[in-house]
């Protein structure tokens, strides 16, 4: 029996799978969940529950390509700091599992294809918004804001708000106030979500020289900012209720109270000098956003009379 002959193909297959997973990791699949959670409800609300399967599918495919392209280019731009941060040291470019030129080519290719896909399958506005989002995320946030100001995620977070704008514009060809309200929800939600995680890994940011707020400010200052932005997030969800029925409004109110309670507990714990668990707020903020936007999707499909 030729044992060597059987082992060699397995090694080749193992290397191929490892390489494939490395390229997949470049795209940050978990980040793309935000696209799905927010874009679908935005599309449903845009036409008050009317479902356009092919149009929605094309929008999601185009949006996912834009998101994966942006995430890949982000990894290229952040390779130097990823190498010195424990949380990101295992990313493909940080451990040189993927050549930088290949990652750059992949990111640019996905970005270009996403633009033409959305333009041809939906409309030009959606394609342009996707292209602007990628450019903003890579050049404005990653290369400029992230390394220069503690307010980096406040303004840079605008890129993460764009899936709702793209989804809305793909259905209507325009941008209306409910789309801006959804944009505001994610815009205000991003700082507490990101800063809660950064509190856990602030030493990483300090070593890398990235001025994330928790790395340059006291915990009391950070949690106060988290509390302010949490209030703004909840307020934005209630503004959106004017375009929905009582169902979404009720869920937004209850979920908002829960989110605010966690933010207040974190702030109170820091003020009292007690041990705190910011990672809990980070994880639960994901659940909060999912609950709000799932309620929006259900509300839109049921199409009950709106509140205004």
Swiss-Prot record:
It is an enzyme of class 2 (transferase). InterPro entries: Protohaem_IX_farnesylTrfase (IPR006369), UbiA_prenyltransferase (IPR000537), UbiA_sf (IPR044878). Its EC number is 2.5.1.141. Pfam families: UbiA. It comes from the Bacteria. It is found in: Cell membrane. GO terms for cellular component: plasma membrane. It is a multi-pass membrane protein. Keywords: Cell membrane, Heme biosynthesis, Membrane, Transferase, Transmembrane, Transmembrane helix. Coiled coil: none annotated. It catalyses: heme b + (2E,6E)-farnesyl diphosphate + H2O = Fe(II)-heme o + diphosphate. GO terms for biological process: heme O biosynthetic process. CDD domains: PT_UbiA_Cox10. GO terms for molecular function: protoheme IX farnesyltransferase activity. Pathway: Porphyrin-containing compound metabolism; heme O biosynthesis; heme O from protoheme: step 1/1. The chain crosses the membrane at residues 20-40, 50-70, 102-122, 124-144, 149-169, 170-190, 227-249, 288-308. Converts heme B (protoheme IX) to heme O by substitution of the vinyl group on carbon 2 of heme B porphyrin ring with a hydroxyethyl farnesyl side group. Carbon 2 of the heme B porphyrin ring is defined according to the Fischer nomenclature. PANTHER family: 4-HYDROXYBENZOATE SOLANESYLTRANSFERASE (PTHR43448:SF7), PROTOHEME IX FARNESYLTRANSFERASE, MITOCHONDRIAL (PTHR43448). Belongs to the UbiA prenyltransferase family. Protoheme IX farnesyltransferase subfamily. This is Protoheme IX farnesyltransferase. The lineage of its organism: Bacteria, Bacillati, Actinomycetota, Actinomycetes, Mycobacteriales.
